[in-house]
């Protein structure tokens, strides 16, 4: 991928896998999903607050983000599902804060993919294709 190439969407299979992961958690832990949805929405609301920085990472310097991180890696399938909506690209920071398995992280040394959040967003969905949660 070159610098000005369009950012490709995740494959249909990866998108379907993200939906399946969300649905599995919704069936097995509906209260977790409810709590996650409430916390994620509260965090989304903070994204529109004025900040003193143009850096997207500043959206993580809020209590709402910390509450999501405290929920632990059990919410990873829910985060991947949220990344299907490109408006939720800030969720990349939440995913990276929760994921501990390097096989499912976008390589930070791959600067083009790591620094472009939308690209990282789509790669996260893709690398989780078929993952057993």
Task: List each model region and its residues.
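Extended repeat-based scaffolds of very large eukaryotic assembly and lipid-transport proteins
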Residues: 1-133
């Amino acid at each position: 991928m070159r610098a000005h190439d369009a950012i490709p969407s995740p494959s249909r299979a990866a998108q379907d896998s993200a939906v399946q992961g969300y649905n599995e958690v919704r069936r097995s832990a509906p209260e977790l999903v409810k709590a996650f949805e409430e916390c994620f929405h509260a965090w989304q609301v903070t994204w529109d607050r004025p900040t003193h920085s143009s850096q997207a990472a500043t959206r993580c310097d809020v209590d709402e983000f910390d509450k999501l991180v405290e929920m632990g890696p059990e919410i990873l399938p829910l985060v991947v599902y949220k990344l299907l909506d490109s408006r939720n690209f800030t969720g990349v920071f939440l995913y990276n804060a929760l994921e501990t398995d390097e096989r499912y992280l976008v390589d930070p040394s791959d600067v083009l993919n790591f620094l472009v959040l939308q690209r990282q967003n789509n790669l996260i969905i893709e690398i989780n294709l078929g993952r057993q949660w």
